Amino acid sequence: MSAGLPIRTATVTRNTNETQIVCSISLDHTPGVDQQIIDIQTGIGFLNHMLHAMAKHGNMSLTLHCKGDLEIDDHHTAEDCALALGEAFKLALGERRGIRRYGTGFAPLDEALSRAVLDISSRPYFCGDLPFTREKIGDLSTEMIPHVFESFATAAGVTLHVDCIRGVNNHHIAEASFKALALAIREAITRTGGNDVPSTKGVLL
């Protein structure tokens, strides 16, 4: 964290008939200076693992607790957790001044290599190519993984591209993709030391 600058943090509560979620995020963890706190309890083990990896490698503190209707399936829980995370990210970031805005991350995991490109643009959009060959990884449907990215991008107000460049093992493809996103986030939210809005429009609403 830069000296004298406020910590970018937010807490979001999201309650519906399908899920009850509390999500707290801090974007400004500094290794060796303050304690990184990560506590993910979604009820979906593999989703916990992915969000933990994203927070860890994004240098974020993240607490996310969800009670969802998993007796139906994993859709509502995975989607709503991503929406809450995106909303908390947007609130923590605040006015989009003095940041790099753009971020790119490449992350390997053995044979898998994934790339994430992020624009904190207030233009919510997701595009991805994740060549999963299994229906599930653990207790998370693989079709929900791109939907998690899409839901996060929508709620956060960012443009996000996540692609697996190569990969065979489905677990590795997923984990490399979340880690690539973490690295892209780290770069995009880096403070520049200025106070300008990184846009020719002068605003990022």
From Swiss-Prot:
Metabolic or biological pathway: Amino-acid biosynthesis; L-histidine biosynthesis; L-histidine from 5-phospho-alpha-D-ribose 1-diphosphate: step 6/9
Keywords: Amino-acid biosynthesis, Histidine biosynthesis, Lyase
Species this chain originates from: Phaffia rhodozyma
EC number in record: 4.2.1.19
Group of enzyme by EC: lyase
Catalyzed chemical reaction(s): D-erythro-1-(imidazol-4-yl)glycerol 3-phosphate = 3-(imidazol-4-yl)-2-oxopropyl phosphate + H2O
One term of GO molecular function: imidazoleglycerol-phosphate dehydratase activity
Superkingdom in the source lineage: Eukaryota
Presence of keyword Lyase: yes
Coiled-coil annotated residue ranges, if any: none
Similarity section: Belongs to the imidazoleglycerol-phosphate dehydratase family.
GO BP of this protein: L-histidine biosynthetic process
UniProt-listed PROSITE patterns: IGP_DEHYDRATASE_1, IGP_DEHYDRATASE_2
Protein's name in the database: Imidazoleglycerol-phosphate dehydratase
Record bears the keyword Lyase: yes
